[in-house]
């Protein structure tokens, strides 16, 4: 059975989801029937085809009025600003991938359902009353057919939570801290301009900029036992894609660098192979651009202090890896039934 999906919001994640669908060869399983985006149709087609981060999309893309063609596939373009006005029922939409970055409350998901969708998947952390938050590769097996309003978490939770799980299962984590070294985002300024967050009033290309993060809360949502045992900070750096996460954890079991790297390398070759990768090559951030894994461990940067303090450096393409996990989760939501 082919799943009929709609994408609500055709920004960075929405476009990457569509592109990842075509590049990953999953079109037999997922069909995009509609995209809702307030922007004009010509701009939507142009930005799908030509991307400053991921390069040209290697499919024929054209737009005729409010229809986007990718190859021979026709996708209806909508420009509604209110979820309640979206014709998901008329279009036979099974799952809405809400990539707007605006919506994330249960009431928002319920509006998608009222408009005729069978299920909703948010591309960002949602409110605590959603049916589930899924970090694919860690807890996706907990999805149930009655889970209709679901969140995919964030790019950073998808990156770090698999590593936390692996370290905890192997060495028993007691507590931890996380520093996210994140590429610039579109909520920052090109040149100095007003923003409610005074640090984000400053030009993104000129500074390393500390920003607030709810990553610690995201970790606790997946692993309640770590409540009050993880803290996180985040800085934005002047690159347009790929994020590094510095994870430090104290563990119960005595370990060495070799112990940690051997375990992570085995996981990357085993059950986590599509989620986690491992490298000891002397790479830099741009080398991980367009990498579909949620997390890539840089084994050259692993450190152990006093046998119980582990520091790891983990890379992720914060757009492409996350877009691929959204597709994985979409397929899982369909397989368990409507």
Curated annotation (Swiss-Prot):
Subcellular location: Cytoplasm
Family matches, as InterPro entries: E4P_DH_bac, GlycerAld/Erythrose_P_DH, GlycerAld_3-P_DH_cat, GlycerAld_3-P_DH_NAD(P)-bd, NAD(P)-bd_dom_sf
Biochemical pathway: Cofactor biosynthesis; pyridoxine 5'-phosphate biosynthesis; pyridoxine 5'-phosphate from D-erythrose 4-phosphate: step 1/5
Active site: 155
Key words of the record: Cytoplasm, NAD, Oxidoreductase, Pyridoxine biosynthesis
Catalytic activity: D-erythrose 4-phosphate + NAD(+) + H2O = 4-phospho-D-erythronate + NADH + 2 H(+)
GO cellular component annotations of the record: cytoplasm
Membrane-crossing residue ranges in chain numbering: none
UniProt: substrate binding residues: 154-156, 200, 213-214, 236
E.C. no: 1.2.1.72
CDD domains per record: GAPDH_C_E4PDH (cd23937), GAPDH_N_E4PDH (cd17892)
Cited Gene3D superfamilies: Dihydrodipicolinate Reductase, domain 2, NAD(P)-binding Rossmann-like Domain
First-tier enzyme category under EC: oxidoreductase
Residues bound to NAD(+): 12-13, 318
Entry keyword Oxidoreductase: yes
GO biological process, one term: pyridoxal phosphate biosynthetic process
UniProt function note: Catalyzes the NAD-dependent conversion of D-erythrose 4-phosphate to 4-phosphoerythronate.
Binding partners and assembly: Homotetramer.
UniProt similarity note: Belongs to the glyceraldehyde-3-phosphate dehydrogenase family. Epd subfamily.
PANTHER family named among the record's database cross-references: GLYCERALDEHYDE-3-PHOSPHATE DEHYDROGENASE 2
Full protein name: D-erythrose-4-phosphate dehydrogenase
Organism: Tolumonas auensis (strain DSM 9187 / NBRC 110442 / TA 4)
Higher taxonomy: Bacteria, Pseudomonadati, Pseudomonadota, Gammaproteobacteria, Aeromonadales
